[in-house]
Amino acid sequence: MSKKFALTAEQRASFEKNGFIGPFDAYSPEEMKETWKRTRLRLLDRSAAAYQDLDAISGGTNIANYDRHLDDDFLASHICRPEICDRVESILGPNVLCWRTEFFPKYPGDEGTDWHQADTFANASGKPQIIWPENEEFGGTITVWTAFTDANIANGCLQFIPGTQNSMNYDETKRMTYEPDANNSVVKDGVRRGFFGYDYRQLQIDENWKPDEASAVPMQMKAGQFIIFWSTLMHASYPHSGESQEMRMGFASRYVPSFVHVYPDSDHIEEYGGRISLEKYGAVQVIGDETPEYNRLVTHTTRGKKFEAV
């Protein structure tokens, strides 16, 4: 059966060529701004969050932003929206998991994010977090990045280098050093950049290689819009210039076919200066109903809301 929001043949061809497609509308700007205002306050209550570890919520660690869809009703509905999932199904097929979500705030004066690619997501932890079967040619995850606020060049929108999704410039088996004071806001080719306490250049296969920033395109979006891209696409973000005192907020939901092994042989995640137990973790089946037993699923949030698969 044809899905209402499925990618057209032209959109599919564009995605295969460039590694991204969009932006598309999930909400009106007014609806998103009002919803985010309420959600932001509600998220301050972490009593039902899947990760209660003190290490996860101390300081400004990026890991504290993981997987709030597991306890928040709006985010639980968001990851299952047909506007998103119909298009993801066009790419990944009839059985799909949402295996992670995370917030990406950018405050006035914040640095831009380093150019990077992610395949197994071992980049910060040193241990693969998703593994595709050996007979599959490709890895990575589909990221759906939704603008919860307006995102523009001045406040730090995303940047993509089209067509870079099929070749990795980084080796995720290398290790990066977590040194926030040293690595954040380093000027790289004239732009202040960092990677949440790491320097992503430490993973480069060729230490003399530089991204082709002349080919980069900005992804300016209105609140309520989303973009779809391969995590293996070269992507970064601009610094927040401080011209506005409003933060920029993005929410990333990450999707893989259900046969991809999520968190293999792992009972915790340790990265970005934090550590969290996976005791209450489960991936969410957002499309279809077939998933191998090696992937642990959850059907409801920690507050009892059912995830509605498409």
UniProtKB/Swiss-Prot annotation:
2-oxoglutarate binds at T113, D114, W115, H116, W145, H235, R248, R254. The complete trimodular substrate, with carrier protein (SyrB1), covalently attached PPant cofactor, and thioester-appended amino acid, is required for substrate triggering of rapid chloroferryl intermediate formation. The ability to install nitrogenous functional groups, in particular the azido group, onto aliphatic carbon centers could enable new methods in the field of chemical biology. Binds 1 Fe(2+) ion. InterPro entries: Chlorin_enz (IPR010092), Phytyl_CoA_dOase-like (IPR008775). One of its GO terms (molecular function) is iron ion binding. Gene3D superfamilies: q2cbj1_9rhob like domain. Its EC number is 1.14.20.15. Keywords: Iron, Metal-binding, Oxidoreductase. Transmembrane segments: none annotated. It catalyses: L-threonyl-[peptidyl-carrier protein] + chloride + 2-oxoglutarate + O2 + H(+) = 4-chloro-L-threonyl-[peptidyl-carrier protein] + succinate + CO2 + H2O. Belongs to the PhyH family. This is L-threonyl-[L-threonyl-carrier protein] 4-chlorinase. It comes from Pseudomonas syringae pv. syringae.
